[in-house]
Amino acid sequence: HPEGNVWTHTLETFRYRKPIGHNRGAYDFRLSLGLLLHDVGKPLSASSGSNRFNGHAELGARAANKFLERLGYDAPLIADIHYLVRNHMLPAALPRLPLAKTREIMESPLFPALLELYRCDESSSFKGPDGYYESSAAYQTYLRNRRNPYRLADGKKIGRQNARGGNHGRS
């Protein structure tokens, strides 16, 4: 990390956390654990050429599971942190990936927390928050299209007969 080592970067992400509601001292516990553990897989990962820390998200998710189990956290919380750590790199690619590859992840009730983790991660690095803004815009477009009965979730218009309950494009 240009900002130092992985630990320095991890601590830096906490500076960008936003409190929940009006209580300035209250933070989302899941997000805090996600920030703490999002790069835990980096020391376990391999590097090849210019691709440093290859596979660190997957390795980190497994390590986070073991760590949280050992501390006695319950399975639902562990599953939430697994989702955040495993997918923390995905928002960077969101604007360029086809909907078929991202729909399931964006449908998760945890996706807003994942975007927030990504914002903190990006803001604490030399990159800044531009990638977050692009990913957030892609997510907002997805949500807007999903709510529109005349568009598919990818934004394509539905034909008139399909919108009125026709064959929905099936033969």
PLM features: residue spans?
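Surface-exposed beta-loop-beta
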Residues: 1-8
